[in-house]
Amino acid sequence: MDLRPEEVSAIIKQQIDKYGNKSHVDDVGYVLQAGDGIARVYGLNNCMSGELLEFENGVFGMAMNLEEDNIGCVLFRGERDVKEGTLVKRTGKTVEVPVGKALIGRVIDPLGNPLDGKGEIETEKFRPIEYPAPSVMDRKPVNRPLQTGIMAIDAMVPIGRGQRELIIGDRQTGKTAIAVDTILNQKGKDVICIYVAIGQKASSVAEVINTLEEGGAMEYTVVVSSTASEMPTLQYIAPYAGCSIAEEFMYNDHKDVLIVYDDLSKHAVAYRAMSLLLRRPPGREAYPGDVFYLHSRLLERAAQLSDELGGGSITALPIIETQVGDVSAYIPTNVISITDGQIYLETELFYSGQRPAVNVGLSVSRVGGAAQIKAMKKVAGALRINLAQYRELAVFAQFGSDLDKVTKDKLIQGERLVESLKQSRRATMPVEDQVIVLYMATNKYLMDLPVKEVRSFNKEFVKFVNSNYPEIPNEIRATGDLSSETENMLKKAAEEFKDQYLRTKR
């Protein structure tokens, strides 16, 4: 074997040049105590609040309590693998979630892991789950409508892009149905939708996903799911993760985003469970003292951004479940005071057949009125007061049969207004069709019709206008207004159709 000293010395010199004596230092601690999804960690003196911690067996947790001699850490998964003495190291970063267009059409958990069996999510973008809300100067007033396709809401409790509108009511009153119908109605409107399921049954989440797929809504929707069987930690971070995904579309793609939190009552319960296990002092209803901040910092991230920042928006629809209609409980009053209005659903209305079961008296939209289209304002202006008068008179009418003509007329019209506002699930209506129906209802064209025929009459009238007078819906769609010329045309169409309808019924 022929040895070449010059080659050997060249290789040695090369190795010496490449050699670096950099040592990698990890901040490491160990577990003092573990159980119930909580680990007490000793030795991580420089740990940040909310920092992601990695345990030696690949389990991750989040630092929540920074105490004098230890850290209270909540675990995401794998609590059985964490025992006394398990090594823990800092990651130096807070909890992040993958974001970007790759998530559209996918079902993920709050950490960004896919749950739909469609393979890994290919994205290099990440955002922290906690992010500061836009300042006052970064925002502009809400001035564009977000149509839900539900007439009772679009007419009387209008929602604008960038608004936070609470959906509140007892269980089984159609809260999720309203949110899902609103997502379905965004088809073709260039709105990205995010549905965050917190503490729901897995079967309920699967049903929602199935509804969205059937309606073609998964093409523009991301589902973040943390079911009731998950650790409270994952339920706690789910809405923040969903909001970070929405912020990526709002800040960087300048898109309009709709996010549904279903529901924040279960979110507060998960946070309460975590806080009590961490030995934080309990307050009213055993919730910790910062439960208001829990929801306010989440909902303040919804905004209509200024034109300088691209003009994107996040519209939030948080859902709260009440117990026996008690809106004065702790969490409902908190969220009512944070949001820009609420849609209150009532059990009695639901079981009496009025669906959506919106209680018009208790529902309000504080900023959406500025975003409502002019045509809707014209036809629905007196709707709320007419319905309120009808409800009041209906109560008195139960006690006496001798009513004057004005009262009888108000009762007859009220019945037909209520009937016109009824809508089935997954039967959303374009705003121009809503204007046509409400014009008919508010201008007393339905007075001499039997109540049971009102809905079929309205449906036929919309078809009649769209086929015989297409310029009416076209103008409302294009301008958002109902000019006097168009109104005259609509009046003519209404009279023509009613004559035709009554002749066929005779």
Curated annotation (Swiss-Prot):
Xref: SUPFAM superfamilies: C-terminal domain of alpha and beta subunits of F1 ATP synthase, N-terminal domain of alpha and beta subunits of F1 ATP synthase, P-loop containing nucleoside triphosphate hydrolases
Cell location: Cell membrane
Keyword tags: ATP synthesis, ATP-binding, Cell membrane, CF(1), Hydrogen ion transport, Ion transport, Membrane, Nucleotide-binding, Translocase, Transport
GO function terms (MF aspect): ADP binding; ATP binding; proton-transporting ATP synthase activity, rotational mechanism
Site residues, Required for activity: S363
Domain of life (superkingdom): Bacteria
Gene3D superfamilies: 2.40.30.20, ATP synthase alpha/beta chain, C-terminal domain, P-loop containing nucleotide triphosphate hydrolases
Residues annotated for ATP binding in this entry: G169, D170, R171, Q172, T173, G174, K175, T176
Keyword ATP-binding listed: yes
Catalytic activity: ATP + H2O + 4 H(+)(in) = ADP + phosphate + 5 H(+)(out)
PROSITE patterns documented for this protein: ATPASE_ALPHA_BETA
EC number: 7.1.2.2
Membrane-protein topology: Peripheral membrane protein
NCBIfam families with a match to the protein in the record: atpA, PRK13343.1
Function: Produces ATP from ADP in the presence of a proton gradient across the membrane. The alpha chain is a regulatory subunit.
HAMAP family for this protein: ATP_synth_alpha_bact (MF_01346)
Family per similarity comment: Belongs to the ATPase alpha/beta chains family.
Name recorded for this polypeptide: ATP synthase subunit alpha
Annotated organism of origin: Acetivibrio thermocellus (strain ATCC 27405 / DSM 1237 / JCM 9322 / NBRC 103400 / NCIMB 10682 / NRRL B-4536 / VPI 7372) (Clostridium thermocellum)
